């Protein structure tokens, strides 16, 4: 169980966010997890550098281990980091410049196979709040270190019918030194 609050204040913006996440093992190799996130932003500039990300974090402070930080196409653009709204599908609303409220849910189906769903509301300046959602199948090859996400349905409709479906598949890959060390020192069973 983790709870966090963050406040950032700059010359041209102020940002406040809070998140709560929990993972519960209810039998051997079976779990469910949920995460709630809220973020609010005041931005006095026309730049989107400080906006909250919906499907991809806006890592202006270089806190995340992104392989393709500024990639918009290709395999590195598909890296997933559970931050900000934490959606696994590339939702049409890509950022929030006023506020965002999101939840990320997942449960084990069988061994490393899970199903997930993300729900949220996004408010951007001069627009009405939007309801956003996605659902899909996840494959935990190594929990928290190497995971694949296969979107099934979202605001875009049935994603599996898309001709470019392979570009929608997301992955998590953690290469931080401390993460790799804890991978080999943690209890596996």
Give a label for each model feature:
Residues 7-9, 119, 151:
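Structural motif
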Residues 120-124, 153-157:
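Short Gly/Pro-enriched loop/turn and capping motifs at secondary-structure junctions
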Residues 137-146, 165-189:
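Outer-membrane beta-barrel "beta-signal"
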